UniProtKB/Swiss-Prot annotation:
<dbReference type="GO" id="GO:0030336">
    <property type="term" value="P:negative regulation of cell migration"/>
</dbReference>
<dbReference type="InterPro" id="IPR000073">
    <property type="entry name" value="AB_hydrolase_1"/>
</dbReference>
<dbReference type="GO" id="GO:0051792">
    <property type="term" value="P:medium-chain fatty acid biosynthetic process"/>
</dbReference>
<dbReference type="GO" id="GO:0043401">
    <property type="term" value="P:steroid hormone receptor signaling pathway"/>
</dbReference>
<dbReference type="GO" id="GO:0003707">
    <property type="term" value="F:nuclear steroid receptor activity"/>
</dbReference>
<dbReference type="GO" id="GO:0048240">
    <property type="term" value="P:sperm capacitation"/>
</dbReference>
<keyword id="KW-0443">Lipid metabolism</keyword>
<dbReference type="GO" id="GO:0047372">
    <property type="term" value="F:monoacylglycerol lipase activity"/>
</dbReference>
<feature type="active site" description="Nucleophile">
    <location>
        <position position="207"/>
    </location>
</feature>
<dbReference type="GO" id="GO:0032570">
    <property type="term" value="P:response to progesterone"/>
</dbReference>
<feature type="topological domain" description="Extracellular">
    <location>
        <begin position="31"/>
        <end position="425"/>
    </location>
</feature>
<dbReference type="GO" id="GO:0120516">
    <property type="term" value="F:diacylglycerol lipase activity"/>
</dbReference>
<keyword id="KW-1133">Transmembrane helix</keyword>
<dbReference type="GO" id="GO:0097524">
    <property type="term" value="C:sperm plasma membrane"/>
</dbReference>
<keyword id="KW-0472">Membrane</keyword>
<keyword id="KW-0325">Glycoprotein</keyword>
<feature type="active site" description="Charge relay system">
    <location>
        <position position="345"/>
    </location>
</feature>
Length: 425
């Protein structure tokens, strides 16, 4: 009898275990996918001014909820992973022309030029000069998607291909792109200004590209001539401050660091003959490079210390990060500047966001936009599971650029009216 009672109780025990297991799995899913996180408009940091009030009226995306895909879109890790593996879905293939520029040290810089597919909303000739993320180029899907959308909104687009990033373009000097070198971007901008003397510029940088474009604008006042505005998306602002956070396992940053370092190693080693070959006349700083340390490197900091800083002769990693970061130059930018980050970006530690917040509190030309979700260069939109081809980020950058163009047009018309009234008097 006791045996029969024990046997009858077993299914109830198993049912309880199953229920607990299901509950545990659901809890993990809810936590990992961040399903309880609300959707909301992005947090905005700015000074009250005529420009900021105009932007709030002209850019609905600044005040509307950003709604990511329901099931996975609130996870910064999944957004980042999808950007990293897919780039974008159903990405278009814009048609452009590749341009080559020989730099003073013999390096061959390339960029791709895409003509507008429609008239711009203000009727002017406007060129977006675009700097992609680390080791990226014009053929990356997120760049193709953004360029296609910008073209359809009347923008000419020039996209820098980072030195050494294109697999089919050989290096012609012992140097490749670094965290903050602005030489190639500056050469592209000068080409555009010379070739299209009537054009005005909208400067756009993604991730590492955001650091480069902000540093470029702040290096000298002349670099801001003909520039209407600048947009930086998902950059970290200070490599010196970021290096410690990149070695932490919080938000899996150490894992992302390893993956990016592995990709950088592959790129560097694919150019080993051009960079380190015996026949190459290279700077003294590269002579003592120990490639065995490169092979065993597991972080970007190790690669930067062993290889990248030596391209420009920096004596230490600290000096390299201090000099190459845009943080020292942000206060010298006087054109309208929009800085965009996602609160759940696993690559950019929240402590780094104090930099754009502080800047926006001091400068009327700066607006810092911080949505809850989006990951690192993700910002996918969609109803439940499948993302849309166009992202919230693509729309926001073009919407902001359109608003600035209209703002400048309004200022110009007001000035013309004042001149006419003065003449009549």
């Amino acid at each position: 009898m006791n045996a029969m009672m024990e046997t009858s109780e077993l299914p109830a025990v198993f049912d309880g275990v199953k229920l607990a297991a299901v509950a545990a799995v659901l809890y993990v899913i809810v936590r990992c996918l961040n399903l309880k996180s609300p959707t909301a408009p992005p947090d905005l940091y700015f000074q009250d001014s005529g420009l900021s009030r105009f932007l709030l009226k002209s850019c609905p995306l600044l005040t509307k909820e950003y709604i990511p895909p329901l099931i996975w879109g609130k996870s910064g890790h999944i957004q980042t992973a999808l950007y990293g593996k897919m780039g974008r879905v159903r990405s278009p293939h814009p048609y452009g022309h590749r341009k080559f520029i020989t730099m003073s040290d013999g390096a061959t810089s390339t960029f791709d030029l895409f003509e507008p597919l429609a008239e711009h909303c203000v009727g002017d000739d406007i060129t977006m000069v675009i700097c992609p993320g680390i080791a990226n180029h014009s053929e990356k899907q997120y760049i193709r998607t953004f360029v296609d959308y910008a073209q359809k909104n009347g923008y000419r687009c020039a996209v820098l291909n980072h030195l050494g990033a294109l697999p089919n373009i050989e290096l012609t000097s012992p140097r490749m792109f670094t965290y903050g070198c602005t030489w190639e971007f500056g050469a592209m901008v000068n080409y555009i200004k010379k070739t299209y003397p009537l054009t005005q510029l909208v400067v756009v940088g993604f991730s590492l590209g955001g650091n480069i474009v902000c540093k470029y604008l702040g290096e000298t006042q002349a670099n801001q001539e003909k520039v209407l505005c600048c947009v930086s998306v998902c950059q970290g602002y200070s490599a010196l401050r970021a290096q410690e956070t990149f070695m932490q396992w919080d938000q899996c940053r150490r894992f992302y660091n390893f993956l990016m370092a592995d990709n950088m190693k592959k790129i560097i080693l694919s150019h080993r003959q051009a960079l380190f070959g015996d026949h190459v006349k290279k700077p003294q700083s590269l002579e003592d490079t120990d490639l065995s340390r490169l092979y065993t490197a597991t972080s970007l900091m190790q690669i930067d210390d062993n290889v990248m800083r030596k391209f420009h002769g920096y004596n230490s990693l600290k000096e390299y990060y201090e000099e190459e970061s845009c943080m020292r130059y942000l206060h010298r930018i006087y054109v309208p500047l929009m800085l965009v980050n996602a609160a759940d970006d696993p690559l950019v530690h929240e402590s780094l966001l104090a930099i754009p917040k502080s800047l926006s509190e001091k400068r009327e030309n700066v607006m810092f936009v911080l949505p809850l979700h989006g990951g690192h260069l993700g910002f996918f939109e969609g109803s439940v599971l499948f993302p849309e081809p166009l992202t919230w980020m693509d729309k926001l950058v073009v919407e902001y650029a359109n608003a600035i163009c209209q703002w400048e047009r309004n200022k110009s018309q007001c000035s013309d009216t004042e001149l006419v009234e003065a003449d009549l008097e």
